[in-house]
């Protein structure tokens, strides 16, 4: 596995669980608001690459005190070794939460069929017709829709996540986006953090919008 980060203890990334977090290198999207820009290239920096053996050693030592492991990115489903890695986690008795953009339903289907994931969080970037604009690449929207259906019908715990980027999406866009999430599925909204954006223009627009907000008198 091409790993680029490891957090041995997190209280906020796996709902209801004390978990470790593993970050994979590489993403096929170029969302301008991404706060993990260093994880976008498929090729990792040898100086910062995380050794899988070291990660497994730490998890083996702590597995009885952890409720699970979050595998995030980047985009984990780009990793050819992902099924093998998840099997290693499962042999430790650890539940697995997968964070994904949903672009590879074939991989997701295999992971679900082999019961290698216990929780799936899929990003919902935009209304379907705006996906290419918001992700910065040509998108196979049908693939994301297939992943959504797989997740909802799988029976595993799941959530859909949206980052509110007001300079890029309108209130009408958010309403249409919310309608894409099947009834009964959890849909969480995350705040855009402009300081970490990959797009200088987006950072500037967010700063300008913040400056124009009314402030209480001192």
Regions found by a protein language model. Name each.
Residues 1-23, 32-44, 61-65:
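N-terminal [4Fe-4S]-dependent radical SAM core
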Residues 41-56:
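Non-heme iron-sulfur electron-transfer modules
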């Amino acid at each position: 596995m091409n790993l680029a980060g490891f957090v041995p203890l997190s209280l906020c990334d796996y709902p209801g669980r004390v978990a470790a977090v593993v970050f994979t290198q590489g993403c096929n999207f170029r969302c301008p608001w991404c706060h993990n820009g260093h994880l976008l290239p498929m090729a990792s920096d040898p100086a910062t690459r995380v050794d899988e053996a070291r990660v497994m050693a730490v998890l083996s030592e702590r597995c009885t005190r952890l409720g699970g492991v979050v595998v995030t990115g980047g985009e984990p489903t780009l990793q050819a070794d992902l099924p093998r890695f998840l099997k290693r986690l499962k042999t430790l008795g650890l539940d697995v939460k997968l964070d994904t953009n949903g672009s590879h339903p074939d991989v997701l289907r295999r992971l679900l069929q082999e019961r290698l994931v216990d929780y799936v969080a899929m990003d919902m970037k935009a209304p379907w017709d705006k996906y290419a604009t918001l992700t910065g690449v040509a998108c196979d929207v049908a693939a994301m829709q297939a992943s959504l259906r797989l997740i909802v019908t799988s029976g595993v715990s799941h959530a859909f996540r949206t980052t509110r980027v007001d300079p890029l999406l309108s209130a009408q866009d958010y309403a249409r986006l919310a309608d894409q999430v099947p009834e009964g599925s959890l849909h969480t909204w995350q705040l855009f953090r402009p300081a970490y954006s990959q797009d200088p223009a987006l950072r500037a627009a967010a700063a300008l919008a913040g400056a124009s907000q009314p402030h209480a008198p001192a």
